[in-house]
Design a protein with these regions (language model features):
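Active-site histidine-anchored catalytic micro-motif
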Residues: 1-126
């Protein structure tokens, strides 16, 4: 995602402005974070499970009313993406995205199974 945004800024010769991105899936999110294995593969997941757990202590899928409507098991996934947000806006200056040295624009998959995701983004500026 981040490399595509940077390439679009260069291709359109836009030096300064903002990018806004949106993931069209209902159970994914866009954010900035340090893409470090412990954070990405453990800490974020544990934090989200503390807020809206997928399984109980016995390993059973926790029932959410969403499951009654769609007959699936990803009610907690919708809550996770709601908290993290499916969109992001970030400024760029001199053709570079303005994020910290350890930050990355990141798609966070919140669903209970793998999916292919589309990200729509716009670059606005001069």
């Amino acid at each position: 995602f981040q490399s595509a945004v940077s390439a679009a800024c260069k291709e359109k010769d836009i030096k300064s402005g903002i990018i806004t991105g949106f993931t069209t899936g209902g159970v994914a999110a866009l954010t900035t974070l340090e893409f470090e294995p412990g954070l990405v593969h453990h800490d974020v997941r544990e934090a989200m499970q503390g807020i809206a757990p997928y399984r109980d202590e016995k390993g059973h899928v926790i029932h959410y009313r969403h499951h009654d409507t769609w007959h699936d098991d990803n009610g907690s996934s919708h809550i996770h993406s709601l908290i993290l947000s499916p969109f992001i806006t970030d400024p760029f200056v001199d053709g570079k995205i303005t994020i910290g040295p350890w930050q990355n624009l990141t798609l966070v998959e919140c669903d209970t199974r793998d999916r292919v995701r589309d990200i729509v983004f716009q670059v606005m500026g001069e």
